[in-house]
Amino acid sequence: SGGQDWAKAIMKDVLTSSLADDTGILANQAYRPVVLYINGAYWGIHYIREKINEGFIAANANVSEDSVNLLVANGRVGAGSEDYQALLSYIKAHSPLNAEAYRYVCDRMDVTSFADYLITEMYCGNKDSGNIRWYRSSETDNKWRWILYDTDITYAAGENWVWFLIDPAGTGTGQNFSTALIDGLLTSGEFRQLFLERLKFNMQNTFRTDKVLARIDELSGKLKPEIAR
């Protein structure tokens, strides 16, 4: 909800969410800026955000809560993490991925969702890229899909954000999070082609410069009346 951007732009997290919403693929939290008072004391601008849980997935994907497996970070929390870890193990064991291995992976995860997630993380330069949420539902195709989450430490110059996400040593704060999934997928020519196609689409549409600047003006315009306070 922008907690680590509170003394700066205040709106980096919601900017990225609002832009990514236009992909039509990535799940992300709706938001609303509010002015907070506690016992009559003015606490400034805050954001009301949807909470990411099984109910969030159920409402956004039109499935039941009981059908949802929601994972956090490296699959260490949530039902179904064993299956995700098995998928990672398969990718590691079969890299470089040939056509058959890539089809196996595609049967278990939405690779377009993952590509759009990576492109969004790279575009905004998310320093906290290890803070991840992803899910699947047994009422759909049971494929893993990614949720855009926690993008308030973003838009800083001076870093190679592409390498930050694919570095075999790890990504995220302290490089504590594995890059095995993306590194394994990048060994597939089919995934690289998909990634380039999604990159082209998103740079020409989702993150088109005039659109991003207009969105910044729109969001900042909502905050300006409160900034002086």
Give the residues covered by each predicted segment.
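Trp/Tyr-centric glycan-recognition "aromatic platform" motifs on solvent-exposed beta-strand/loop surfaces
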Residues: 1-2, 18, 128
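Fold-level signature of zinc-dependent metallopeptidase catalytic domains
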Residues: 1-10
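Middle-to-C-terminal accessory/interaction subdomains
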Residues: 5, 26, 33-37, 42-46, ...
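Zn2+-dependent metallopeptidase catalytic core
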Residues: 11-25
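Short, charged N-terminal helix-start/capping segments
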Residues: 30, 36, 51, 63-65, ...
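Acidic, His- and aromatic-enriched active-site or binding-groove loops in soluble protein domains
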Residues: 48-73
